[in-house]
Amino acid sequence: MLSYAPENAYQRASTMENKKVFPKEKSGLHPRNRHCSRYDFDALSVSCPELIPFLAPTAYGDISVDFADPLAVKMLNKALLKHFYGIEYWDIPADSLCPPIPGRADYVHHLADLLASCNGEVIPKGKNIALLDIGVGANCIYPIIGQREYGWRFTGTDIDSHALSAAKMVVSMNPTLKNTLRLKQQKDPHAIFEGVWAVNERYDATLCNPPFHGSAEEAAATTRRKLHKLGKNEVAAKPVQNFGGKNSELWCEGGEEGFVSRMVAESVAKAQNCFWFTSLISKKTTLPAIYHALRYVKAVEVRTIEMAQGQKVSRFVAWTFLTPEQQAAWVAERWA
């Protein structure tokens, strides 16, 4: 067991007085989420010894990493992916998005429930189930989790060639991903599906974590607020993203609302080639505009699935153009 004892008796007594009792499980996470319990840093350090230098005692007497340190967050993710998902090699460029894995896993599990709701409450599994990850990034988080949990096959797209190069290395170094994750570059920064979705390709679902902000300035302001909440009161003029992120990952013209609205518009051309289109929606205020866009394109069915990670509430919107009869035919052909 790892030990991080205070230096003297006074510190030990002070630490015990300040020790905060945390719940054993994180509230709100999906019941199948492997991260419902608090991080077991002893076990994670056994799986990934590189994590050990980033561990330190907190003011409350437990052990954690500095979530304002991008290297610490990256190493925590590396340890989680190795310990829970069997990923032997995982590395991303310093300026790439390093997302919190528990929340990403929740999206995958709730998406599995969405598919199950159309299949007699049975989750369709295996390589016959094909998903399209828009903005896969260097981290490949959704394909890693989806393949490990449900055996799904993924196509991941991105506009960033450097991110895709890093993603290709992750795929090549992990046998479980070699035949289950295909990567494509989106060469048109204004397109989402066009150019990466062949005419004859069919997907059981799409998923996406869209750029959140409408400008680089807005993204930087959000970073400063996050660092302040983490106790970093002296914030640099150009702060480092604690979870990383290049411009294309963090912001785009029109922000989240503009990006997802364009996705809705493009989905019409692929209406019969996909069962469920989905996208995360971080801002609740974005929903009315997305619902309006979906009414305009005459989506047959729209669902909003809420997720909670502690006090944070997020959701994804799902839509389909398939009628109930077409849905039944799809299930019989692909999921039986």
UniProtKB/Swiss-Prot annotation:
Main location class: cytoplasm
Superkingdom as given in the UniProt entry: Bacteria
GO cellular component terms listed in the entry, alphabetical order: cytoplasm
SUPFAM superfamilies: S-adenosyl-L-methionine-dependent methyltransferases
Protein keywords: Cytoplasm, Methyltransferase, rRNA processing, S-adenosyl-L-methionine, Transferase
One Pfam family of this chain: Methyltransf_10
An annotated GO BP: rRNA base methylation
Signal peptide (from-to): none
Location relative to the cell: Cytoplasm
Coiled-coil ranges per UniProt: none
MF-aspect GO terms: 23S rRNA (adenine(1618)-N(6))-methyltransferase activity
EC number: 2.1.1.181
Enzyme kind, highest EC tier: transferase
Recorded catalytic activity of this chain's protein: adenosine(1618) in 23S rRNA + S-adenosyl-L-methionine = N(6)-methyladenosine(1618) in 23S rRNA + S-adenosyl-L-homocysteine + H(+)
Similarity field: Belongs to the methyltransferase superfamily. METTL16/RlmF family.
Alphabetical list of HAMAP family matching this protein: 23SrRNA_methyltr_F
Function text: Specifically methylates the adenine in position 1618 of 23S rRNA.
Name the UniProt record assigns to this protein: Ribosomal RNA large subunit methyltransferase F
Lineage: Bacteria, Pseudomonadati, Pseudomonadota, Gammaproteobacteria, Enterobacterales
Gene, per the UniProt record: rlmF
